[in-house]
Each structure stands twice: as C-alpha cells, then as structure tokens.
Amino acid sequence: MPTCPLDQSENVNFFTEKNSHKIYRCQQCGLIFVWPLPSDAKKLYSKDYFEGAKNGFGYVSYEAEKQIASGTFNAFLDAIEKILPQRGKLLDVGTATGCFLEIAQKRGWEISGLEISQHAVDKACQKGLDVKIGELSDASADKPAYDAITFFDVFEHLPSPKETLQKAYNLLRQGGVVAINTPNSKSLPAKIMGRQWYAVNPPEHLRLFDADNLKNLLELSGFEIKSVCRIPKKLSLSYVLTVLANHRKSRMLKKASNLFSKAGIGSWLFPLSFKGNIFILAKKR
C-alpha cells in the first residue's frame, strides 16, 4: 500500500480505479491521489488536449472556452489585487495558451508564464507573451523575484505539490501571494457523485484536495491564509457536454456537443460551477 504524499500517513484506503490507474484516499488528511504516478503524464498535453480532446481529455477549443472564462479570470485578479493593489510581477504556472496572462497584462501586471506543453507555449508566444516551456522547479532566480504566483486549474495536475509550494515560497518576495484554484474534494458535487466525480480523472488529475488539507499544506510551507472561497465560472453548453462526454466515455454526448456547436447554441453560457472548485489566497510570511 502507498503512503500519503502530503502527510506520509500509511492510513490510506483504496478509492477507485480509472483509466488503468489506482486511486487512494488518505484517511488522515483526506487527500485523494493516484499511485503509482504515471511515468508519461506530460505526453497528455499535446495539441489534441487544447484543440479537439479526441483522446478523452482536455478541450474541444481551449481558446474559445478560456475567452468565455475572462470574467472568472478578472474575479481572480480582483481578489489578488485586494491584497496587492500595487500589482507587480506575476508568474502564472500552467499558463496554457496565455488567456489569463493577457488579462493580467491589461490590468497592469508585469507578467510571465510557465507551461509544459510546447504547443501551448507556441500559441502564447504568438500573442507576444513571455511564456517559457517548463515547470516551476525549472524557474531560477538569485533572489525572490515575484509578487504573485498563480496556479489556476493546475494544482490537481501536479505530481509534487509540496515541493512546488516550497519553490513558490522561495521565488516570492516578502508579502507576495500565491493563488490557487482547484477542484474541492469536499464540495457538494464531489460528495454527490463520489467516485464518478468529474475530477477523478487520471492521468490528467493526480492530486485532489479539500480546503483543510490545502490550507494546512500552505501553512506548513510558510504561508498565511488570506482568503478561502469559491469563484463560480460561466460554462458554455459545449464545454459542459464535452466534460460529461469525456468523463462518461459517451459518444452520444460528444455528438450532441458538436451538433450544438454547429447550430450556434454551444456557446450559450450558464453562470454556475458544477465542478465544485475552491479558490485560496495565501501570503508569504
């Protein structure tokens, strides 16, 4: 049996198996995690992940969906700017094609991003954005260089969240903030759907947190919790159907998504968050 990657507890139970990956839940801290970790998870983030989702993961059109999410990105920045009204240098981890960075730049932030997908990096650079291939562990600085480091819909993909937060702490200036938006394993949708919850989706999602264990991890990493909330998203009809189709492996839902998109109603928006995400802001002590 594995040990919990957060608290090293051996009190873990088998949770489920999906996509040929075993998933466990720590009975001490509640973390849901994949074990053993897949060795080739990075291969998932090819062009198909951002344009097509033919292999059952990702987006039909990441650019279209993230443009829809501009209101959510602005809400994230509103929360950050309550703590850092002067703005400053912002590093976005897992920046994809740079939709969030475009908005942050327009609001006066000095932006940069990291992304493991070469396809996404190329798209972001075509927009004139400062985005480099790599992970946070690849970032280097002689001294703390950033005022904010963001992980939006990224933390659940990370194989080593503890090490990632320690690196973020070292890269942040005193009083800098880390912002995380990630699925909440204690949310109402998670409780209702159980093992069928959309976020239980390896090898895409490797670690699923709740507010308590994520706050504890941040505090142990040297951060002071400033805000814990849920920021709803406006989701398009096509996106909702695509997520459900991928999760249920349903050709019928996939066809419905494509049909509605061609009919022009796939872009209809719903101001809700069936995903049950959690948004946490923490400040470097």
Can you say where each PLM-predicted feature lies in the sequence?
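A SAM-dependent methyltransferase catalytic signature shared across enzymes that methylate proteins
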Residues: 5-12, 212-229
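A short glycine-rich, Lys/Arg-flanked "PGG" loop and its adjoining helix->strand segment in the class I
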Residues: 162-177
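Short catalytic micro-motifs in class I SAM-dependent methyltransferases
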Residues: 152-159, 204
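Short N-terminal helix/helix-N-cap motif within the alpha/beta-hydrolase-1
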Residues: 159-163, 190
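Conserved N-terminal segment of class I S-adenosyl-L-methionine
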Residues: 1-152, 162-165, 230-231, 243, ...
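Short, glycine-/aromatic-enriched active-site segment of Class I SAM-dependent methyltransferases
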Residues: 180-207, 212-218, 240-245
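A C-terminal cap/extension of S-adenosyl-L-methionine-dependent methyltransferases
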Residues: 2, 227-285
